[in-house]
């Protein structure tokens, strides 16, 4: 079996899944104290990198996703699967776990 090189462009979410690049978490507090990784809040904001074709309805039609590539979104804190690609953090989650489009 040949090795597959994973990049953002080779990840194709299925169904209503959305692939999001996670925004960087704060490295230090407002008072200037550096935070260790274990003390950082898990980010809940990111940019949509890839979008699946949409949820399959009972009649066989597809429900078009409400987000597009490039949208900045707010998502549920513990939703989805965390993925690391090329040093960047991503999360793969269902569209229902997206709470809002930001900006």
Swiss-Prot record:
Keyword Oxidoreductase: no
GO molecular function annotation: ATP binding; metal ion binding; protein folding chaperone; protein-folding chaperone binding; unfolded protein binding
Keywords: Chaperone, Cytoplasm
The name this protein goes by in its record: Co-chaperonin GroES
Alphabetized Pfam families for the sequence: Cpn10
Species per Swiss-Prot/TrEMBL record: Prochlorococcus marinus subsp. pastoris (strain CCMP1986 / NIES-2087 / MED4)
SUPFAM superfamilies: GroES-like
InterPro entries noted in UniProt: Chaperonin_GroES (IPR020818), Chaperonin_GroES_sf (IPR037124), Chaprnonin_Cpn10_CS (IPR018369), GroES-like_sf (IPR011032)
